[in-house]
Amino acid sequence: MKAFLKICMVLIFVGVAHAKNPLTLSKEEEVLQNLQSFSAHFKQVLKNEKPLVYYGVLKAKAPNWALWVYEKPLKKEIYMNDKEVVVYEPNLFQATITPLKDKTDFFTILKQLKKQTDGSFKTTINKTTYRLVFKDGKPFSLEFKDDMNNLVTITFSQAEINPKIPNEIFVFNPKDENIDIVRQ
């Protein structure tokens, strides 16, 4: 009888403990929770009266590093970390360095996303709402409205979850000594 009571107590304890655990994470939630690095080609569409389309490659690494390399229609590189953003425009021989006032780097956005009933993920940071959609278990598109109220849609392809990315690529090193460096 004592053994039976012990078994019942253990089963009740396990049942209560299991009931207190949150629901198991979806595959997408697990990806977001365990994401340490991300690499993908992207297509960025800025929708206004005349839509603008950009193509390039994104490399990002936790906790808050990102490198956006725009290849078309104009070359541009954007380096982000927790302190500043460097926008390098090789055609203009110019790099603009701006202190990062708001935490709106790629990983800050991803870590704050919450799953919605439609399966997408959303978060709002500094009055900007970001919406991420997954496809085949990987981030597929990120939408938001920019500060001029234009809808921006970034579609990812050839996405890699947690690839090895060397830290050095996130540091801006001028390729030409004749460029202007503008600090804002």
From Swiss-Prot:
Gene Ontology CC: periplasmic space
Cellular compartment(s): Periplasm
Superkingdom: Bacteria
Pfam families given in the database record: LolA
One GO-annotated biological process of the protein: lipoprotein transport
Signal peptide from the UniProt entry: 1-19
Keywords from the named record: Chaperone, Periplasm, Protein transport, Signal, Transport
Keyword GTP-binding appears in the UniProt entry: no
Principal subcellular localisation of the protein: periplasm
InterPro entries found in the cross-reference section: LolA/LolB/LppX, OM_lipoprot_carrier_LolA-like, OM_lipoprot_carrier_LolA_Pbac
Protein's job: Participates in the translocation of lipoproteins from the inner membrane to the outer membrane. Only forms a complex with a lipoprotein if the residue after the N-terminal Cys is not an aspartate (The Asp acts as a targeting signal to indicate that the lipoprotein should stay in the inner membrane).
PANTHER family: OUTER-MEMBRANE LIPOPROTEIN CARRIER PROTEIN
Assembly description: Monomer.
Family to which this protein belongs: Belongs to the LolA family.
Protein name: Outer-membrane lipoprotein carrier protein
Species for this entry: Helicobacter pylori (strain J99 / ATCC 700824)
Gene name of the encoded protein: lolA
